[in-house]
Design a protein with these regions (language model features):
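Active-site anion-handling motifs in enzyme catalytic cores
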Residues: 1-470
Length: 474
């Protein structure tokens, strides 16, 4: 695009959805708006706010990469900004390749706003060696379109420098700069008690491999007001539908599994929007666990937090920002959250925040990006717009059968069935036009003929208890 003095700069942001996109719980889960992990929205929403200035508009591109959209992006946008988490990991190699293919076709600046490599707590990068050509190609294409690449911490910086790259800057994660150059965290009480409201979080791997299940179980016994905050799509599906097609969801030691005591007691939550997530946590006294953005959400709410680091991605971020943390491998399995709370010191986090903020915004300026705190209203308009919207509540365990809890689920399923029937009608019409009459029974309409296709498609998005209700009579 060509710049015009009176035209706002149009920035395309890689994010699951716009912060102002309000969807029902069912729609959010069906669309997977947080790209399997709600923590992604914490840093993408922060990036959206930071990039919004009087001279720039921000647009969400979605998470799925489409290289064929390159020409449209070149024509419609002035820059492509890509906040990433642990993108340098084997399981993300294919999406990283697709992103590289897109970037190769772009003629506009491409700025990576924080990316991390994932390895062990010992910073051993040997597991990343097989994907080194993919990482090298990605970073090369990014640096061909920007002054430098922003990384999350010391490990990723060294990883790229060992590959020969020099234009690498440690900037942390945009999420920590949601509120600008100040950061406030306050211990509301001298010590935790049985009456304290505590949040715990953790991944399936931390529970399965590192014994986090034992820590959670004992904390649950000690603290009646303990709540587990989930983040993954499969956890949301288990909470809302009591079932997921993902085999990892069968792990019964996770509080998001229907057989877990915390699930049965209704002590599990999952938020699909950062604004409700952070607002909910303001009432808590403490947060701990292995999820970095689960604990960053609490810190942004002003709540003391401690991260139990299980890999390099969480460890390097905690070290950079001065977030209280422990290696989960060195943490006793009977640790009391009260001990973590007492040991947590936020001096480094708070006192060094402004310097880190200036480093972050300096990186942005060197890459041609303005920020709302220096060049705008500090996010006031952004926050005001969010405040006018009504976001859905947290996803909670489905442990009751009252009409109110069922109405939203069945209303959504009815609308999905109508959509599927309409699609079937359209497909039948297209088939008729192209090849004449067909004998397959996929059309919409009354009676059993309409059921097989619609039922098979609807069953993929709901749990077994609901599928039984939807199953046509034989």
């Amino acid at each position: 695009m060509t710049d015009e003095p009176s035209r706002k700069r149009r920035i395309l942001l890689r994010s699951g959805k716009s912060p102002f996109d309000v969807a029902s719980l069912e729609q959010s889960l069906h669309r997977d708006v947080f790209a399997t992990n709600a923590g992604n929205l914490i840093f993408s929403d922060a990036a959206h706010k930071i990039l919004t200035t009087p001279r720039a508009e921000v647009f969400s591109n979605g998470i799925r990469t489409d290289p064929s959209a390159a020409e449209r992006i070149n024509e419609e946008y002035d820059a492509f900004v890509v906040p990433l988490a642990n993108a340098f990991r084997p399981t993300f190699e294919r999406p990283l390749k697709r992103m590289t293919q897109l970037i190769k076709k772009l003629r506009i600046p491409v700025v990576v706003l924080g990316v991390g490599a994932q390895a062990s707590l010992t910073y051993d990068a040997s597991r990343l060696k097989p994907m080194e050509p993919t990482v090298r190609e990605f970073v090369t294409e990014v640096l061909n379109r920007s002054a430098s690449i922003g990384v999350r911490g010391e490990f990723t910086e060294q990883y790229l420098k060992d590959m020969g790259f020099r234009d690498v800057e440690v900037i942390g994660c945009p999420s920590m700069f949601l509120n600008g150059d100040t950061f406030r965290v306050e211990k509301k009480t001298e010590a935790l008690t049985a009456d304290s409201l505590i949040s715990v979080n953790g991944s399936h791997s931390a529970v399965r491999v590192h014994g986090l299940d034992s820590i959670i179980r004992q904390a649950h016994e000690r603290y009646p007001h303990l709540r587990f905050i989930g983040q993954n799509l499969l956890e949301a599906q288990l909470l809302h539908w009591r079932e997921t097609s993902n085999p990892i969801g069968a792990q019964t030691s996770m509080p998001t599994h229907p057989s877990h005591p915390m699930y049965r007691e209704g002590k599990v939550r999952l938020f699909v929007d950062p604004v409700t997530w952070i607002d909910e946590l303001r009432a808590y006294d403490f947060s701990f666990g292995s999820r970095i953005h689960g604990n960053i959400a609490a810190l942004l709410a002003g709540v003391p937090s401690t991260v139990l680091c299980s890999d390099s991605r969480t460890l390097e971020l905690c070290r950079y920002f001065g977030i209280p943390h422990r290696k989960i491998t060195d943490t006793p399995k009977d640790i009391d959250p009260a001990d973590l709370y007492a040991a947590a010191d936020f001096g480094e986090l708070v006192n060094g925040h402004k310097e880190r903020f200036l480093r972050f915004t300096g990186f942005m300026e060197r890459n041609g990006l303005e920020n709302t705190f220096t060049h705008g209203d500090g996010g006031a308009a952004f926050d005001a717009q969010l405040g006018k919207l009504s976001f859905p509540p947290a996803v909670r365990p489905w442990i009751d059968s009252d009409p109110e809890s069922l109405s939203g689920r069945f209303s959504w399923m009815q609308s999905r069935m109508e959509e599927l029937n309409a699609q079937n009608t359209m497909l039948r019409s297209q088939l008729d036009r192209r090849s004449g009459p067909v004998s397959i029974k996929v059309q919409a309409g009354d009676g059993a003929a309409a059921w097989p296709s619609a039922y098979r498609r609807a069953r993929r998005v709901v749990g077994r208890p609901v599928r039984k209700l939807l199953r046509p009579e034989q």
